[in-house]
Regions:
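Hydrophobic faces of transmembrane alpha-helices in multi-pass small-molecule transporters and flippases
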Residues: 15-46, 71, 75, 79, ...
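Helix-terminus/linker motif at the lipid-water interface of multi-pass membrane proteins
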Residues: 38-71, 89-90, 127-136
Length: 224
């Protein structure tokens, strides 16, 4: 004997599942996130390709430093995920005070963590890099550019946090625009500065790239 549901309940459930407005909103959010992800991947792929043009040893040294950045991202992305969930819930409930509280709490923790990670990696990098490569020239290049990687980590928390906040608030278009603009700036400045200053110029462009993402999203923040 099958389970019977009232027709009105079935219709209500169908309308909730097949709500075109909400479905299109979901499609738009996911498409924006996809573009943002492609822009992120493209940025780091371009950074690696540009480093390769400066020589195999430079490419290897940059790859070592990117491991520190990747490691830090696991920590900072955790705070961004918490901000996405908790600030997103407050935003959906139209609770402005709670929204600001959640943003402030998670951002302060992320900033402290980023500072500790940056200082820790800068202080320990000269000891850990030799474990990652046996090539002395690669080691020296990596240690020489270690301050730029540490600086990137320190300033990157803002972009991570704002990404999480905007995703939670389903304001993904701003996040997409910020990442695409930052990618264009990275390619333009990276091409210019790497030609003038070599790998130092390339790293400075990467730091500017992550900063631009945060600055642009900060300009969008008042719409939340």
């Amino acid at each position: 004997m099958g389970i019977r549901y009232p027709k009105a309940r079935v219709v209500a459930l169908k309308n909730r599942i097949l709500n075109r407005k909400k479905l299109w909103a979901l499609v738009h959010v996911n498409s924006d996130i996809m573009v943002r992800t492609l822009a992120l991947i493209s940025g780091f792929a371009w950074f690696a390709q540009q480093g390769a043009q400066l020589g195999d040893e430079t490419l290897a040294a940059n790859h070592l430093l990117l491991q520190f950045i990747t490691l830090s991202a696991f920590f900072l992305d955790g705070y961004a995920n918490v901000a996405e969930m908790r600030a997103g819930q407050a935003y959906g409930a139209v609770d402005k005070q709670r929204f600001q509280t959640e943003v402030r709490r998670t951002t302060v923790l992320a900033a402290i963590t980023a500072a500790l990670l940056g200082v820790g990696i800068y202080a320990s990098g000269s000891y850990t890099i030799p474990w990652l490569s046996q090539d002395h020239h690669v080691q020296q290049l990596a240690i020489q550019h270690l301050p730029y990687a540490a600086l990137y980590i320190v300033v990157s928390f803002a972009a991570f946090q704002l990404d999480g906040i905007f995703i939670g608030a389903t304001q993904s278009r701003a996040m997409r625009n910020a990442t695409v603009l930052a990618l264009a700036v990275l390619i333009a400045l990276g091409t210019w500065w790497s030609a003038l200053y070599g790998n130092r110029g390339l790293w400075v462009a990467l730091v500017v790239y992550i900063t631009i993402r945060a600055v642009v999203l900060s300009c969008y923040y008042p719409i939340l």
